[in-house]
Amino acid sequence: MPSTAADVPAPNSILCEQCGYTLDGLPPDSRCPECGKPVIESLSGDGRSPAEWEAGRRRLPGFLRTTRQVIAIPGTFFRNTTTRGPIQSAKIFAALHWCIASILFATAGWIHWFAVMANDTIVGLLPALAWFGIFLLTFASLWGTTLLAAKLSAWEGRYRGMRLPPQVVLRGLYYHAAHYLPVSLLALFSTAIYASLSRRNPIAYLPYTTYYLYAISAEVILAAVYLFGTYWAAMRNMMYANR
């Protein structure tokens, strides 16, 4: 590892979107000296445009289509989405997904503890308060983790000579929030299925509780791998963007 930070390209420098080579001063009809990609494809022909949610369609159809694109084709989405400009719309998109994921995680946590582990022996107001507490804690954790990841990613980018300013990283992480949806749905599905089976015949399913806990632990590991992989897909396709 180098002992000093690498030089970060200037914000207005033109980078090759294929390899990151600085193209300043090269004519549009030439090619990148590093990888051979036509310079024009890193300029007006880069194919980047605002996400549907951001392009004046902040309604349910735009939200759903943008969510589908982020989840189904993350590399393509971040390769074709603009990285500059105001990030308020992206932040609202993230907040909606944090809220949805927090509801799903809170419900999964509630089912896991009160329906599976406690077997409905705890009644009264406590279960409702616990659900609301898990919801608030999850929402705050997702928000805080995003801000921390943005700071660390921008710092790492500067150290390694990547042009990843905080606003660009935040925009990417705000849209990356859509990936919490499949993770939270899987958590809810797993806990709900086991709770439903165990409630029908608690004695018969009691020996399988250990396997259920193993499965939940495996899901946590797989979710971490999935979230990091999609995070890197976002950063990799944004760090050479020119607009």
Question: Model features per residue range: what roles?
Answer:
Residues P2-I100:
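N-terminal juxtamembrane cytosolic/stromal segments of multi-pass membrane proteins
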Residues S3, D46-P50, G124-A128, I203-P207:
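Short hydrophobic/aromatic-rich motifs at helix boundaries and adjacent loops
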Residues T22, P38, D46, L125-P127, ...:
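Alpha-helix initiation/capping motif
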Residues P38, H112, V183-L185:
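A generic membrane alpha-helix/interface feature
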Residues S44-G45, F105, L197-R199:
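Short, surface-exposed, polar/charged, turn-prone segments marking secondary-structure boundaries
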Residues D46, A115, L186-F189:
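Juxtamembrane helix-loop transition sites at the ends of transmembrane segments
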Residues L60-L142, A154:
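Core alpha-helical transmembrane segments of integral membrane proteins
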Residues A128-R243:
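Hydrophobic alpha-helical transmembrane segments and adjacent short intramembrane/lumenal linkers
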